[in-house]
Amino acid sequence: MSGILPHLLAASLYAFLGFHFWRTRWSQVAPKAPAGIRAWERLALALALMLHGNVLYDELFGGGVMRFGFSAALSLMLWLAVLIYWVESFHARLEGLQPLVLPLAAACTLLPSLFPGQHLLANVASPMFRIHFFIA
């Protein structure tokens, strides 16, 4: 898949989950909030992460060259934040973070399609560059 459709799918799923968590965890009209994150919520978040990860991979490594820009960096940071949150949700209760993080992730998922100003990276074959990039 190419174009804006994969970005829209991932962003829509993040936005839906953010709205859902806001209604069930933060809203004053919500009934008693469920304890912890439910299985379907965790699965939907995993699906959003996979869609967003696929979009990022295509943005960064599509066409056989590596491209990186400001919008891709923001998208990558929010993907990593949601991934860390998702993994940590298996071990600790982190309610209250979803309504904050997921709308930002939805917005940042769309950024690479709206602002595609990326430049080609020259030293991608260098092992030192690869180490630096993956550590950063």
Regions found by a protein language model. Give the residues of each.
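Alpha-helical transmembrane segments and their membrane-interface exit regions
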Residues: 16, 77-85, 106-110
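Membrane-interface helix-loop junction between the first two transmembrane segments
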Residues: 18-41
